């Protein structure tokens, strides 16, 4: 997890984890809520979210999920 500094204009949070099963839309929503719970921000800031998935080696039968959030502070 990346650390943020008070004076930065753009902040990025990246959460990466591996699970051995696919998740549905409701579970995606829970992952986003988890990411936001780690990312405190004023409501007028701009937030962008990207979720990436990557299949790992066949013998692992797992997916790597990455949630990225970018916060741009409004002045």
From Swiss-Prot:
Q: Which domain of life is it from?
A: Viruses
The organism of origin for this protein: Sulfolobus islandicus rod-shaped virus 1 (SIRV-1)
Q: What is this protein called?
A: Uncharacterized protein 75
InterPro entries in alphabetical order: SIFV_Orf14
């Amino acid at each position: 997890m990346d650390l943020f500094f008070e004076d930065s204009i753009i902040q990025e949070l990246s959460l990466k984890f591996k699970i051995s099963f696919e998740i549905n839309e409701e579970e995606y929503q829970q992952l986003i809520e988890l990411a936001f719970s780690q990312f405190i921000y004023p409501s007028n800031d701009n937030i962008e979210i990207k979720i990436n998935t990557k299949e790992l080696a066949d013998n692992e039968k797992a997916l790597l999920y990455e949630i990225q959030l970018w916060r741009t502070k409004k002045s």
